[in-house]
């Protein structure tokens, strides 16, 4: 039988995605046996984040201010609005340094089987943001999973019906990729989405 505090820590670690009971136990043992200072740092950082982070009122990404740095920047192209599923997708788009518009972070994707509908992905806020009078194009940058595709389709239809230009990220062969190593579905999509030179 384990001490209640240890059991509580293991159960708390299980809330993380992809962490089952064995992984949670290994993490707990590591933090308690080998890295107590790291455990204190982790606890402090988590407490700080919970206290100081909230959602940007414009893009819904995490921010310490009411409006995040990207939304507040005067150097961004306010005519473009990229819709991404999660903050990690926002960060990936920023890392490319190829997009200079604004964002809206859904904090998920439509998944009726999991009980995630339009309200859970803040669709009403997205529509209001897209119709603010400055946005000319909405770029749907959701993932190419069945749920991401359904989310993009739903959002695209709603926004096109309101007169907005809507585009979707292209997909296909990765940069530097060799055709013999690309799966047939990706290659087929690349052929369908080809463009003239």
Curated annotation (Swiss-Prot):
<keyword id="KW-0863">Zinc-finger</keyword>
<dbReference type="InterPro" id="IPR000093">
    <property type="entry name" value="DNA_Rcmb_RecR"/>
</dbReference>
<keyword id="KW-0479">Metal-binding</keyword>
<keyword id="KW-0227">DNA damage</keyword>
<dbReference type="InterPro" id="IPR034137">
    <property type="entry name" value="TOPRIM_RecR"/>
</dbReference>
<keyword id="KW-0234">DNA repair</keyword>
<dbReference type="Pfam" id="PF13662">
    <property type="entry name" value="Toprim_4"/>
</dbReference>
<protein>
    <recommendedName>
        <fullName>Recombination protein RecR</fullName>
    </recommendedName>
</protein>
<dbReference type="Pfam" id="PF21176">
    <property type="entry name" value="RecR_HhH"/>
</dbReference>
<dbReference type="GO" id="GO:0008270">
    <property type="term" value="F:zinc ion binding"/>
</dbReference>
<dbReference type="InterPro" id="IPR015967">
    <property type="entry name" value="Rcmb_RecR_Znf"/>
</dbReference>
<feature type="domain" description="Toprim">
    <location>
        <begin position="79"/>
        <end position="174"/>
    </location>
</feature>
<dbReference type="GO" id="GO:0003677">
    <property type="term" value="F:DNA binding"/>
</dbReference>
<comment type="function">
    <text>May play a role in DNA repair. It seems to be involved in an RecBC-independent recombinational process of DNA repair. It may act with RecF and RecO.</text>
</comment>
<dbReference type="Pfam" id="PF02132">
    <property type="entry name" value="RecR_ZnF"/>
</dbReference>
<keyword id="KW-0233">DNA recombination</keyword>
<dbReference type="GO" id="GO:0006310">
    <property type="term" value="P:DNA recombination"/>
</dbReference>
<feature type="zinc finger region" description="C4-type">
    <location>
        <begin position="56"/>
        <end position="71"/>
    </location>
</feature>
<dbReference type="InterPro" id="IPR006171">
    <property type="entry name" value="TOPRIM_dom"/>
</dbReference>
<keyword id="KW-0862">Zinc</keyword>
<dbReference type="Pfam" id="PF21175">
    <property type="entry name" value="RecR_C"/>
</dbReference>
<dbReference type="GO" id="GO:0006281">
    <property type="term" value="P:DNA repair"/>
</dbReference>
<comment type="similarity">
    <text>Belongs to the RecR family.</text>
</comment>
<dbReference type="InterPro" id="IPR023627">
    <property type="entry name" value="Rcmb_RecR"/>
</dbReference>
């Amino acid at each position: 039988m384990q001490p209640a505090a240890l059991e509580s820590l293991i159960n708390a670690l299980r809330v993380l995605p992809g962490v089952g009971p064995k992984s949670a136990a290994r993490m707990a043992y590591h933090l308690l046996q080998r890295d107590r200072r790291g455990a204190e740092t982790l606890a402090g950082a988590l407490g700080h984040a919970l206290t100081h982070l909230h959602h940007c009122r414009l893009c819904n990404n995490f921010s310490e201010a009411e409006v995040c740095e990207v939304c507040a920047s005067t150097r961004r192209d306010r005519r473009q609005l990229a819709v991404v599923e999660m903050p990690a997708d926002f960060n990936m788009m920023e890392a490319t340094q190829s997009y200079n518009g604004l964002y809206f972070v859904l904090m998920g994707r439509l998944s009726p089987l999991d009980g995630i509908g339009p309200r859970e992905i803040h669709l009403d806020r997205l529509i209001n943001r897209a119709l603010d009078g400055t946005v000319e194009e909405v770029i749907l940058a959701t993932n190419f999973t069945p749920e991401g595709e359904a989310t993009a389709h739903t959002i695209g239809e709603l926004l096109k019906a309101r007169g907005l230009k809507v585009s979707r990220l292209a997909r296909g062969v990765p940069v530097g990729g060799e055709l013999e190593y690309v799966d047939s579905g990706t290659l087929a999509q690349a052929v369908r989405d080809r463009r003239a030179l």
